[in-house]
Amino acid sequence: MSDLPRTITASQNNASRLDTVTVEQLTGGERADAVTLPTGKRHPLPNAHFPRRPELLWAADEKYFPTNGHRRWKAGEILHAMHGWAVPFFKSRVLPGDFHPLIAYLFNEWKCNLECHYCWAYDNHVKGMTEEVARRSIDWLHSTTCRVLALMGGEVLLRPDFAHRIVDYATQKGFWVYLPTNGRLLRPDLIDRLADAGVATFNLAVDAWEEKPGLPKAMVPIRKNFEYLIRKQYKYGYTVFLNINICRNNLDDVRQLTELAHENGIATDYHICEEPMLSQASFRHAENNPVFIREEDHAAICELIDWLIARQNEGWHMVNSVERLAQMKSFIKHEIDHWNCRAGQNSLIIRVDGSLAPCFPTYSATYDWGTIENPKMDAKQLQEMKHSCEPNCFSTLNHILAFCYNDGRVIRWLAKQAMHGFQGIRGNME
């Protein structure tokens, strides 16, 4: 049996942002564990070979710096992105059925080395994923349409050798690998190993310039790691973006971090601070939280969002579309409607024990969506659940996926990229 929390009490249910029927459905069952291997048989990850690309490890960084500020992407890098995203997408449009994942979030850790006061997605009493579950997860995903693998936690680099082996194994099977981290453990030697293994993008999560109450993910403590990561991206062929959560107490920091990203030619991705969708037994900051947005903060947050929109209209690189940024102003006022979430259909999460769930907010749910090798995503159940949760959720990734499931949008967006030779991303999925 897994050591994940299995129950949520009635008093905890009262704190949920979902309706009572949905909460009871999500917390009243008992999910299955991943099927164990026969006694005596192990299925660990192979050791990661390093360096795989010694010519890059020893090459001068300056040789690969952009000419005239314009980064050039090689044909192999473009094809790798196509095989990761475009090919699975088109397969999902023509294959029968509803379950065709494009991206999977592999929770290799549920522990974290920091404590952000908005974050419920960790419990330092829960053991991380085993090598066997990691390998079986990747093998199973390879048998589906999925070719984008995102490590997830907690902090994914708590066991750096383990993370390196996951990345190496996944990239050798053709996955486009996405690695999010708070950057504290992302030291130069580890950057070299992960980059050599083939990480496609680093999502560097920072919410403040210097640490402040409730927001330890700051730039100052990781500045040297950040600069090394930026410098090495050109020769290894990965991208970097800053992932910033807009809270009530970091509005000036958001501007400063956005300017830093622009100065370094990288993109930014914004989230709006949300309270947990389902109450979490390990979450300790439900009351008197300095980061949660209050009604008196709305005007200042709307002003910040308008500033971000203006910067994007000037050509600053952002993952969020202008439309989605503008919707943040509606979301904080509880005015968001349904938006065709694709969780459980084209995205999913794999918990540390190998059990499945549609999305991050449902990590603690006890409803049985199956396990690796035996998924049980039910279209009717997902539709009923999303009727309650969609208006209460501001998932950036699933909203982008929702926009993709409009063929006209995709064709127009791909045509725009093709006109520029697929040299970087031009515009958002509008």
Question: Where does each model-flagged region fall?
Answer:
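Conserved alpha-helical substructure of the radical SAM core
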Residues: 2-8, 13-18, 28, 42, ...
